[in-house]
Amino acid sequence: MLAQSCCLRLLILLLLFTTIGSVPKKSLKYFTNRKLRERRIKLFGTKKTEIQSLLISTWNYTDANLQAWSVLQQGPRRTRQAVIQGCMACQNQRCGRLLTGRSSPDTEGALTLEAAIMDGESLEYGAVAGMNGVRNAILVADAVLKYTKHSVLVGKSATKFARSLGYKEEYLTDARTRNVLKKWRSNGCQPNFWRDVHPSPAENCGPYSPLPEHMHQHPMHQEYAIIQGQHDQLAFLALDAEGKFHVASQSSGAQFRIPGRVGDSAVPGAGIYADNEVGGAVASGDGDVLMRHLPAFLAVEAMRAGKEPDKAAELVVQRLLRHNTEFNGAVVVVNRRGIYAAACAGLDEFHFVVSGGKEYLSMARVERVKCLERENEVIDGGPKGLFPTIPEKHKVP
């Protein structure tokens, strides 16, 4: 038995060495490292592609974009500081109806702010909403991310949290705010966000009481108007040469909103989203619609499923229009290689500012995207004007 066992083992070894000897060294090495190779291809693609730093901001405020870009260029892993700087620059300058304009109160005349920041590496998110009395809401949102296990703080409690960390509280409403509110009230409180109440919110200021359900009307819904230079939200996206993303958004809220309303800037996936493995996206427009559909999140997930940035942006705006035919707004999408695209609806064209990127045409260049004609209900999408189509060599494998 022992002799038979030894012979059997020798036969197996002989067959094994004969098989290995018949396999070329290259093939043997390939099979030995196959799993490692497959993992590398899955994670990184077959070719190593250089990533250029990129800073994108919504609308056409070039000064704020340049300030954020200058921070991004100070060294590696500066994406967080860059998007924060961009938000602070716009909060302390005149960017649309943000705080410096003092022209976006709620119906009671209060100026409340919201902001959010997201880390594309950890997927951590920090935000505040309905916060009154603290100027740079983005700093408080960043503090929520860094110093708490929460994602969003709201209202007076967010203000109290900010004070506990040493942020100065100040009275934000001034004569400009009161004048805006006075004109609105003298115009019958038009426009407003009420519906199916009595007296008719289309003609009266209230107070209102609910109509019986059988009296509810369903007129064509007019979305919140987004006008160049009159918007109340801005978003920033930063990508560095290591492939790290941060996105941030800051808003003074919809003008003449009902007190207590939370906007898209504070809701994960609505105004901003980023994942280093895939890319990032920022959206701007009617915040109540954005919160229902989470377009920034949808855009990133569309890229995860294999869509190029232009097709992802197109897909998202089509989704919004399918359910909200009067939607006003836009989405800007960036993949992990730094290729970007945008799509929009409800405007003649949407502007956003780009610094860096593969083309390096210029810093703080204003890109323009022509929006769709509503009657078509199809996004022609993609770049227009200075915005180049995606070269074949730059497409993600």
Swiss-Prot record:
InterPro entries per record: Ntn_hydrolases_N, Peptidase_T2
Name the keywords, alphabetized: Disulfide bond, Signal
| GO cellular component labels | cytoplasm; lysosome
Q: Name the Gene3D superfamilies on file.
A: (Glycosyl)asparaginase (3.60.20.30)
* Keyword field contains Cytoplasm: no
State whether keyword Nucleotide-binding applies.
no
The secretion signal range is: 1-22
- Cysteine disulfide partners in this protein: C90-C95, C189-C205, C344-C371
Name a Pfam family for this protein: Asparaginase_2
Q: Which domain of life is it from?
A: Eukaryota
Instruction: Name the Gene Ontology molecular function terms of this record.
Output: N4-(beta-N-acetylglucosaminyl)-L-asparaginase activity
- Give the similarity note: Belongs to the Ntn-hydrolase family.
Identification of the protein by name? L-asparaginase-like protein CG4372
Annotated organism of origin: Drosophila melanogaster (Fruit fly)
- Give the source lineage, highest ranks first: Eukaryota, Metazoa, Ecdysozoa, Arthropoda, Hexapoda
